[in-house]
């Protein structure tokens, strides 16, 4: 007779209850909703909140909690804004690396150059996704601000 073994469900104080199984594959964090593009398909035109950057201490606190409770295999930085625009982005990546948390980044690629590549290698970002939303240079120009 085969017995199905269910993965252990961990309880987290006051937030998740017993229904969420950890670790998650990834947790997405929006460091900023500021972006250097003005894409026609982006819902930011409908956004009513102010453009801002997440507070460094808050981000570090979230990373600490994810590391302490082993909540996810990886944190991915993206959502509405361009993560490279956060003024303390590399400090945030360093903080995650020091806590043993793998990081992924989704970017529009405009900040990627040789210098950024060297910095990314030092902070051991485990994944960099470049979001290419256009098939050619002409359509790219229409979405870039």
Give short role names for the model-derived ranges.
Residues 1-128, 138-143:
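Conserved alpha-helical substructure of the radical SAM core
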């Amino acid at each position: 007779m085969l017995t199905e073994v269910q993965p252990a469900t961990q309880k987290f104080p006051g937030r998740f209850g017993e229904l969420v199984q950890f670790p998650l594959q990834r947790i997405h964090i929006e460091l900023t909703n500021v972006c250097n593009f003005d894409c026609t398909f982006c819902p930011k035109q409908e956004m009513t909140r102010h453009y801002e950057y997440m507070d460094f201490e808050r981000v570090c606190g979230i990373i600490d909690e994810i590391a302490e409770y082993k909540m996810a295999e990886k944190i991915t930085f993206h959502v509405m804004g361009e993560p490279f625009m956060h003024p303390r982005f590399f400090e945030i990546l360093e903080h995650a690396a020091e806590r043993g948390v793998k990081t992924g980044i989704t970017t529009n690629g405009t900040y990627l150059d040789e210098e950024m590549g060297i910095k990314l290698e030092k902070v051991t970002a485990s994944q960099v996704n470049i979001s290419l939303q256009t098939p050619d240079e002409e359509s790219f120009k229409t979405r870039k601000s």
